[in-house]
Amino acid sequence: MVNTGRVPLWLVGLVGGFAVITIVSLFIYGSYSGLGSSL
């Protein structure tokens, strides 16, 4: 296990989870807007 300094593990998980949710929401929004424009 590598010690990344004084950054707590919950903060890393929170930032990672927020990034995943943002990417997924952008993908869903892009596919939804693309589907609407194609129709």
UniProtKB/Swiss-Prot annotation:
Stored InterPro entries: PSII_PsbJ, PSII_PsbJ_sf
Entry's transmembrane regions: 9-29
Gene Ontology BP terms: photosynthesis
Keyword Phosphoprotein recorded: no
Known partners and oligomeric status: PSII is composed of 1 copy each of membrane proteins PsbA, PsbB, PsbC, PsbD, PsbE, PsbF, PsbH, PsbI, PsbJ, PsbK, PsbL, PsbM, PsbT, PsbX, PsbY, PsbZ, Psb30/Ycf12, at least 3 peripheral proteins of the oxygen-evolving complex and a large number of cofactors. It forms dimeric complexes.
Known function: One of the components of the core complex of photosystem II (PSII). PSII is a light-driven water:plastoquinone oxidoreductase that uses light energy to abstract electrons from H(2)O, generating O(2) and a proton gradient subsequently used for ATP formation. It consists of a core antenna complex that captures photons, and an electron transfer chain that converts photonic excitation into a charge separation.
Name of the protein in question: Photosystem II reaction center protein J
Lineage: Eukaryota, Sar, Stramenopiles, Ochrophyta, Bacillariophyta
